[in-house]
A protein has these predicted regions:
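A C-terminal junction/extension of Radical SAM enzymes
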Residues: 421, 428-429
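Helical hairpin unit composed of two closely spaced alpha helices linked by a short loop
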Residues: 376-397, 402, 407
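Short glycine/threonine-rich loop-to-helix capping motif typified by GTGT followed
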Residues: 385, 411-415
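Catalytic-core elements of nucleic-acid end-processing and repair enzymes
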Residues: 439
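N-terminal localization/anchoring segments of enzymes in phospholipid and broader phosphate metabolism
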Residues: 1-357, 361, 365, 405, ...
């Protein structure tokens, strides 16, 4: 045990070293670009002309893009005021969505996978008839992301991540055919070791096991030999978008999804990653609040497709699936529940912000109340307007954010949004026991979401995300009850941020808000 602990500490230290190395490499790339241009003094006029032309082209490109003004303005200001630095940063992290070749690869895989999902028009008609406002949102998701609405699915909500982990371990042990796991962060520590022990047993029983994680999300948690270690015990493992020094147009796009699929029958998703802090095994930021859901039935097909998309698109050199049908299976399952559920995914590979549009649609459809829980609150003008307009219509709009931050700078930006919201009637609560990482929304006792999508630019525009839209089911009731309990542990900071702020504080917050879209 002591040896394992020492080994774990060594791996964590190596991961932190690699994180520091990655940050240093990015800074060196920016410095290199600036230095090259600056030192060519004898060509100052040519360089100046070239920089101005390039800056102008980039500004025009930004202006003509489909991005919101909140996304465009910071880059335009940065490029115009500091052309060399602005152009360098934009080339490194501002080009959202990867290369044309990469987008083609994702589109090709989607063209094979997504049509394998059922159309479920009868189910869509039923939800439109029973709950018209939820039906409209379900229709939007299906028309713009291919993911259909389902019934014949039992839904279990977990108000604590550790409950989700326990349920996952139980279901993983029952696997007979395959296990798919996709997570933003995996920590080679206690929580993962529990999962790994079960996975090893299932591999020995002939079960196919695949594990997929984001390189930057896990960089401080595991060492580079993790993939080799998994492969040595029979677990197929791939890494999303590994950091490599050099110009990477895909660097800012991370896989933030959290999915487990067992035999195509049972699926899990939610806000938690597979690291100790999510289950309160460690407490770096006080108590950790996270949530998740378990699906059993027809809707698991969508989670399977979401996993297979990323697994097969991550590398054109890897050996990929040629027959998806053996994983997308329709079982003769009879659910006890009759509610509606719609797992969906969002991608920076297209110009459709499904995650944000679902949230805004729910806000616009709200008649009585609309509540959110999010770890970060860094939102566009469009979402700000929707929240404020709902509050001005008399809708009870509430947002729960952490009382203890994981990133103080980001927390200050989150708080900079409070005043603009509360002055129009939105109520803001901070969860005093610690850090709430859950990403949930609920409207009028009839529909809710639970998944990976934060109320911030990175989730809404840059990351690969997934969520679960639910309506007319017990999970919606349980989410509401959980939010009420959570608000009982919060401090209501609405009145505190209604009052005016000092000029110094306003200036600082305006500066941070200006560049919020770059984060």
């Amino acid at each position: 045990m002591k040896q394992d602990t020492l080994e774990g500490k060594t791996k964590t230290k190596n991961g932190i070293k690699r994180l520091c190395f990655s940050i240093i490499c990015i800074l060196l790339e920016v410095i290199f670009i600036i230095t090259i241009v600056t030192r060519l003094n004898e060509y100052a006029e040519i360089i100046n002309l070239f920089t101005r032309i390039l800056s102008g082209i980039l500004v025009l490109r930004l202006y003509a893009s489909d991005k919101t003004s909140s996304m465009k303005m910071p880059w335009v200001i940065l490029i115009l005021i500091f052309p060399i630095m602005g152009v360098g940063l934009y080339l490194l992290i501002g080009l959202n969505g990867g290369t044309h070749k990469m987008r083609e690869r994702y589109a090709e895989i989607d063209s094979k996978l997504l049509p394998m999902l059922p159309d479920n028009q009868e189910c869509l008609s039923r939800i439109k008839e029973k709950i018209p406002k939820a039906g409209n949102i379900a229709s939007y998701i299906q028309r713009n992301s291919w993911y259909p609405i389902y019934q014949n699915t039992d839904i279990k909500y977990f108000d604590e991540a550790v409950k989700g982990l326990e349920a996952q371990l139980e279901e993983l042990a029952k696997a007979q055919k395959f296990i798919f796991m996709e997570y933003h962060a995996i920590e080679d520590a206690e929580a993962w070791h529990k999962i790994q022990d079960v996975l090893e047993e299932r591999v020995k029983a002939g079960v196919e096991v695949r594990v997929f994680y984001d390189d930057m999300g896990s960089i401080g948690f595991i060492n580079t030999d993790f993939v080799k270690k998994m492969e040595s015990i029979g677990i197929h493992c791939r890494v999303f978008n590994p950091f490599v020094p050099g110009l990477n147009l895909f660097l800012n796009n991370r896989d933030h999804r959290k999915i487990t699929v067992i035999d195509g029958k049972v699926g899990f998703t939610g806000g938690y990653n597979l690291a100790n802090e999510y289950f309160n095994y460690t407490h770096p930021y006080g108590q950790w609040k996270d949530t998740g859901i378990r699906l059993e039935g027809d809707a698991v097909q969508s989670l399977t497709v979401t996993f297979l998309e990323m697994w097969n698109a991550v590398s054109e050199k890897a050996t990929n699936d040629t027959d998806f049908s053996k994983y997308i299976i329709h079982y003769d399952y009879k659910a006890q529940q009759t509610g509606f559920v719609q797992p969906y995914a969002d991608s920076p590979m297209d110009n459709e912000q499904v995650g944000e549009e679902v949230y805004i649609s729910m806000i616009n459809k709200a008649e009585n109340y609309c509540w959110f829980m999010t770890p970060y609150l860094i939102i566009t003008d469009e979402m700000t307007h929707a929240l404020c307009l709902a509050a001005k219509r008399g809708v009870d709009v509430r947002i729960i954010t952490p009382g203890i931050p994981d990133k103080k700078f980001i927390y200050n930006i989150t708080r900079s949004f409070y005043h603009g919201l509360v002055k129009h009637g939105v109520r803001v609560y901070e969860w005093t026991p610690g850090f709430c990482h859950a990403k949930m929304s609920i409207v009028d006792d009839c529909m809710a979401t639970c998944g990976t999508i934060n109320l911030d630019y990175r989730s809404l525009y840059h990351h690969f995300e997934n969520g679960c839209f639910m309506a007319d089911c017990q999970a919606v009731v349980e989410i509401k009850n959980d939010l009420i309990r959570t608000m009982g542990e919060c401090r209501d900071v609405t009145d505190q941020y209604c009052t005016g702020r000092s000029a110094y504080l306003r200036l600082g917050q305006l500066f941070m808000r200006l560049f919020a879209g770059l984060l």
